């Protein structure tokens, strides 16, 4: 991200510190965004160091193309393709660290035409990669009440999922023109949510759920997590920032599962060193949240959680 106050990289130093940068190491920034983490990683690398950055947002790719550092390369893709990219570059098992900054970026929220924000009027798009797949508008125009309610409940933990789904589908069936604008959808949702939270817009959970579904965000994360063990070198680090409970739960459970050995009955003559042979990861420290100062400077960082693990 740029140095604009609107585009402040969340947990910048903490996430990069989590990688324990080796000057001549090879690193992957799976979510380039506007380049805040990537630029800091490059500043810590020596002449033989290398950074591969990935993003599926064409605007992020345009920003990355302004970096002329020979140690840096950008790939237009989703971060679930990290194993394929590393395979093509003959880097499987050689990566010293992977950084993922999950969710939607500030520039994406701030640009009304991207359709991510219920606070700005724009076309109802919500795609991270605007060159691929159905937009939110196209999907909502064809979805059933049951399917929409499932998405809102599963990915937004929305308690009024059925009521909202009925309102959205009913509107699209009866109106001469389908729902096509962000504020239009936000108002339809607000009109049917019976209880208002003064600290949260009634459309917050629904917009999150639709965005996650449109971009297959949790599937992407699962693929990236499962491939990390193959891609990372021994002592390679995984540094992941999540912004909502669904993402953080996945990251936490993955790291916990991969850092615990099999349960062995007490009394068996097995050395602890033998048990640890089959444990692929170890967690590094505790989860890190933004400081009060960072939250004050950048309120969007409030829900961020950083978790770090190291391959054994």
Curated annotation (Swiss-Prot):
PANTHER family: 12S RRNA N4-METHYLCYTIDINE METHYLTRANSFERASE, S-ADENOSYL-METHYLTRANSFERASE MRAW. Specifically methylates the N4 position of cytidine in position 1402 (C1402) of 16S rRNA. The lineage of its organism: Bacteria, Pseudomonadati, Pseudomonadota, Gammaproteobacteria, Pasteurellales. S-adenosyl-L-methionine binds at residues 35-37, 55, 79, 101, 108. It is found in: Cytoplasm. InterPro entries: RsmH, SAM-dep_MeTrfase_MraW_recog, SAM-dependent_MTases_sf. NCBIfam families: 16S rRNA (cytosine(1402)-N(4))-methyltransferase RsmH. It is an enzyme of class 2 (transferase). Keywords: Cytoplasm, Methyltransferase, rRNA processing, S-adenosyl-L-methionine, Transferase. Its main location: cytoplasm. GO terms for cellular component: cytoplasm. Its EC number is 2.1.1.199. It comes from Glaesserella parasuis serovar 5 (strain SH0165). It catalyses: cytidine(1402) in 16S rRNA + S-adenosyl-L-methionine = N(4)-methylcytidine(1402) in 16S rRNA + S-adenosyl-L-homocysteine + H(+). This is Ribosomal RNA small subunit methyltransferase H. GO terms for molecular function: rRNA (cytosine-N4-)-methyltransferase activity. Transmembrane segments: none annotated. Belongs to the methyltransferase superfamily. RsmH family. It comes from the Bacteria. GO terms for biological process: rRNA base methylation. It holds the Pfam family Methyltransf_5.
